[in-house]
Amino acid sequence: MKKHIFIMMLFALCLTSFQAHAQRYLPGMKGLQVTAGMADGVHWNDNTDFAYHIGAAYSVYTKNANRWVIGGEYLHKKYDYKDMQIPVEQFTAEGGYYLKFLSDRRKTFFLSLGLSALAGYETSNQSEKLLPDGSTLLDKDCFIYGGALTLELEAYLTDRIALLANARERALFSSDIGKFHTQVSLGLKFI
């Protein structure tokens, strides 16, 4: 009897110690992600220079758990002027490469560093250059280009859905409004 109990305990131990983990970050896998967040600081009321962004991207995984990313983003920011706020909007396309540099043993959490090229269009005050007080807005609508450096954390909720948290610094050298924008966002990725 003791022999049977010992064999069953050994079998149960083998079942729990050699668990198979989900297949994640394999070459050729594809994912679609949606993110939203705040830019240039955290402002919770409408009376400040509140800024937000939303974006969508498509990822293709390569060797060593790295990935190519292509996507688009919309950034909206308000600038104070006298007793009004002037909206600035940026529409950008992104193409970049993300390098995974840290993950846990169970492949639940992944930390990646990404470098992207950005290009798009920037508009000030919805292209209205004459302000209500008679002033003329000198900032012109223009094409913008630059890059972004991103630190991204992926936490897998299921085998096909991951929660994203990222921080990124965008540098847009041809912008009339601001060259640098810091963004913090949350999102979901569907594999």
PLM segments and residue spans:
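Membrane-embedded beta-strands of outer-membrane beta-barrel proteins
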Residues: 54-56, 93-97, 113, 149-151, ...
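Predominantly the C-terminal beta-signal and adjacent terminal strand-loop region
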Residues: 75-78, 147-191
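Short coil turns and loop connectors of transmembrane beta-barrels in diderm outer membranes
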Residues: 3, 24, 28-30, 64-66, ...
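Extracellular loop and loop/strand-boundary signature of outer-membrane beta-barrel proteins
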Residues: 41-44, 79-86, 133-139, 170-175
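Residues that define the transmembrane beta-barrel architecture of outer-membrane proteins
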Residues: 28-30, 48-54, 87-93, 109, ...
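Gram-negative (and chloroplast) outer-membrane scaffold detector with strong preference
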Residues: 57-131, 190-191
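Short glycine/proline- and aromatic-enriched beta-strand/turn motifs that initiate or cap beta-hairpins
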Residues: 21-70, 187-191
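Cleavable N-terminal export/targeting peptides
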Residues: 1-29
